[in-house]
Amino acid sequence: MKLFLLAAAAFSAPALTVSELNHIKSLNPRWKAGIPKRFEGLTKDEISSLLMPVSFLKNAKGAAPRGTFTDKDDVPESFDFREEYPHCIPEVVDQGGCGSCWAFSSVATFGDRRCVAGLDKKPVKYSPQYVVSCDHGDMACNGGWLPNVWKFLTKTGTTTDECVPYKSGSTTLRGTCPTKCADGSSKVHLATATSYKDYGLDIPAMMKALSTSGPLQVAFLVHSDFMYYESGVYQHTYGYMEGGHAVEMVGYGTDDDGVDYWIIKNSWGPDWGEDGYFRMIRGINDCSIEEQAYAGFFDE
């Protein structure tokens, strides 16, 4: 009975600890570590539910048309999509207890690039739930492949979040692919991409793609120290690999110490990181952040 109680206590114990935080701080990372409000009291399983198995990142190489530019010389030194297109980017959202980061980041990239292209009369928040429920080439709350979801967004597309709001964060289930809006008022109307490209591992091309046509969907390997991120330019410092995560890259820059970084929008809500965003070191493929960089295109 005593062993059972000890095991139960360990299972329900908070995943982030002061002792591990202090160890990370002792390594003097260039970024600020803490226990984010988003993760206070959460168990290891609850935090792990936000991630995907690493296999979703490793099995995707060479799975999409390559993106490149003949001229990469006129790339600006810095770019922040939030500043250049403040009317486009919606609020930071929270994927909840579902490993649907692949859907959130692809749909966010899809919507923001449509906004840059001027295809919507007003900025539209598109539905990650429709993608989770209807894209059977991916695994709903258990993860997804970036090339697969972009194939889905070109062949099928997605609808608005108003029509099909997000539920899987609380249910942790795929749900049924809807044919009507949640309120039953109208048939689901779908917007699609015409094509997609992968700019991964070509940093100048990634920078030019960001500054000329909008955000990119990227993915990286998450280590335990990343869960303690609060601010600054993250670089992996300590800990085991916990899984994979897909996010929306929205810009790049250089800090006061001359460290190049990417600006990235997460899907863990505004109580994590720099108001829901984080910066990650640029140019060394830290945690494989530069291996995949997907962009959708629209010829409407």
Swiss-Prot record:
The keyword Signal applies. Residues 1-19 form the signal peptide. It is an enzyme of class 3 (hydrolase). Its main location: other. Keywords: Disulfide bond, Hydrolase, Protease, Signal, Thiol protease, Vacuole, Zymogen. Gene3D superfamilies: Cysteine proteinases (3.90.70.10). SMART domains: Pept_C1. The keyword Protease applies. It comes from the Eukaryota. Its EC number is 3.4.22.-. It holds the Pfam family Peptidase_C1. Thiol protease which is required for parasite excystation and invasion of the proximal small intestine of the human host. This is Cathepsin B-like CP2. It comes from Giardia intestinalis (Giardia lamblia). The lineage of its organism: Eukaryota, Metamonada, Diplomonadida, Hexamitidae, Giardiinae. The gene is CP2.
